Amino acid sequence: FVTTPDLLQYTRGEWLPLVIDVEYWNSIDARPNNAIPTVLHMPTNSKLKGSQQIDSELMKLETAGKIRYIRPEKKVAASLVPSLIEKSDIVIDGLVIGAYGVTSCQAMAARRIVIGNTNELGKIRPECPIFHSDPAIISSVIHDVIDNRDAWKSLGEAGYQFTKKYHDGSLTASKLSGFLDS
């Protein structure tokens, strides 16, 4: 088993989705209706997430008044993550590796717009509502997301439904049960 779809290119295996408490994250207050979109990036590993390029582009957009950028200076304690996601309209996860992780799942379950590198995921889960980006195109992707604000509600719902389908634990339990019973 592999926990992220990008690993399937390196080994024979089956995707075993990571598990979050989808209903807990869905209980976070509805996305704020900020006049200026609030964008959150809280990397666990800055190099693997492409944070240098993300910071550079998002600071330019913040200076231009297009967004408000939340960027914790250090790794965020798990207890603080819900309040940061609650304040955000858009969450940017990793842009370097073609996979998404816990932060993306939490943000999707909370009905936030998520941007990340989904290169490998598109091959096996094309319905994933994460906006694809890499460091080279993050500025244009952010502009596209901001310009399509009318779609945010339906995209937030799609994110919630995606996490409910793949990350609430039932699919993972079913796959593990089948494996353990064989």
Task: Locate each region found by the language model.
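A short, active-site helix/loop in glycosyltransferases that binds the activated sugar's phosphate group
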Residues: 1-15, 56
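Short alpha-helical segment that forms part of, or immediately flanks, the ligand-binding pocket
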Residues: 82, 104-109, 123
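Conserved donor-binding/catalytic core segment of Leloir-type glycosyltransferases
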Residues: 16-20, 24-49, 55
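Short hydrophobic beta-strand element within catalytic cores of glycosyltransferases
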Residues: 112-116
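A charged, aromatic-enriched C-terminal amphipathic alpha-helix characteristic of glycosyltransferases
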Residues: 150-181
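A short alpha->beta transition loop at the rim of the catalytic pocket in nucleotide-sugar-dependent
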Residues: 89, 109-111
